[in-house]
Amino acid sequence: MSRKLKLKRVIARLDVKGPNIVKGVQMEGLRVLGDPEEFAEYYYNQGADEIIFSDIVASLYGRNSLLEVVSKTAKNIFIPLTVGGGIRSLKDINDVLRAGADKISLNSAAIKNPQLIDDAVKEFGSSTITIAIEVNLLDKKYEILYNNGRELAHIDLEKWIIECQERGAGEILLTAIHRDGTGQGFDIKLIDQVNKIVKVPLIVQGGAGSTKDIEKIISYKVDGIVLSSALHYTKIAQKDDTYKDTSSEGNKEFIKNKKTFLNFKNLDIKMIKQIVDS
């Protein structure tokens, strides 16, 4: 049975390390950008349909430090809040939901222990469980990674998606690491490949940098688009038009190759919503 698409969702993703939002390129060369609660409230006021918080070092260090951020944010925004990173057990899920999250995102823990998907769905419901799948293009092949893109999972992409669906996952969050933070557009080939097998809502991330990218993706069968760099740097530029990108910070190798973090064309949520809703 083919899935029925609802109205597209425009989702802001905030990668958190300690008390700060950070962002890099292809999950490397991280920069501190600001306060997660302030950014989340800003995107909420702009009309975001959902916020994703991801603790990008939680899985690596075996911790979950987002509870306070989630609790404070949930008091001021009234749209779905999804939380990922460091969630390894039903207790972790319960703690995050009690803090104010509406959904949780599993990646590393699900790869290491797929039974957690079944248990989480049984305990909290399918609509609460999102499976995050991070994919990189390595030697012309799409490979799944985990621990925020640090380790190869050695799992076939299509088989993993099918397994997650069969275990009851309510949604797939597909991130193209090789497009992350580049502003070079979504990986349409990857999305096409996944669309052939996915039966649950699919939200995609990685590469949005212009209105043309948004116009192109809405013609494909995706339920939502997730943006981070494109929104963050537009927000910073609007707040301080003296902000400049330099090769003295962040991923120097990426910038040296004549690409920059600011390869974005003044994208904000209000503008994106107008395109999506037109």
How should these model regions be labeled?
Residues 77, 81-104, 189-227:
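Catalytic cores of alpha/beta
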Residues 50-69, 108, 173-184:
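Glycine-rich, proline-tolerant flexible connector loops at the mouths of alpha/beta enzymes
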Residues 117-124, 215-278:
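C-terminal helical cap(s) of enzyme catalytic domains, especially alpha/beta-barrels
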